[in-house]
A protein has these predicted regions:
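Hydrophobic helical membrane-anchoring modules
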Residues: 38, 62-148
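Acceptor/aglycone-binding surface of glycosyltransferases and processive sugar-polymer synthases
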Residues: 1-69, 96-103, 107-113
Length: 148
């Protein structure tokens, strides 16, 4: 069995700030774009994860990885590029009234934007492989639909 990334999939209650939901949607869409995986990424920013040791070690050893708010998203993208399977687990999330966030609006958005710029370049360098994988997965899904 191939090692998998266990990734939290947040189930937000009504306390979640709208700007956080919108930011997550943008990140999820962009992460899906740079991995060519339409709808596969449930939540790119959730830090509730269990990483498979060998792929994680190789990624960290041979790649520059953002060390702040972009870390979780970048690792997820790189794991998908390496074709590491992802298992999503639901995680209940609520935001306490008056809770403190470690997110710094300007600084962290700039860092995340630069991370996505690097990931876009990485996607284009890997495009032939990612596109072939995407087409293969799409044809497999189509085949499964016709078998039903």
């Amino acid at each position: 069995m191939k090692p998998s990334l266990i990734c939290g999939c947040p189930k937000f209650d009504e306390s979640v700030p709208v700007e956080r939901l919108n930011g997550r949607k943008i990140s999820n869409n962009y992460a899906s774009f740079v991995t060519l995986t339409d709808g596969y990424i449930k939540d790119a920013m959730c830090g509730y994860r269990i990483y498979p040791v060998e792929p994680f070690y190789k990624i960290c050893r041979f790649s520059y990885i953002d060390s702040h708010m972009g870390f979780d998203t970048e690792i997820l993208i790189r794991m998908i590029w390496k074709n590491v399977p992802i298992i999503y687990m639901p995680v209940e999330v609520s935001y306490p009234v008056g809770g403190k966030s470690n997110f710094r609006m300007i600084r962290d958005n700039i860092r995340i934007s630069f991370m996505f710029a690097r990931m876009t370049i990485g996607m284009w360098l890997r495009y032939p492989i990612l596109n072939k994988r995407r087409k293969s997965q799409k044809s497999e899904k189509d085949k499964n639909k016709t078998d039903e």
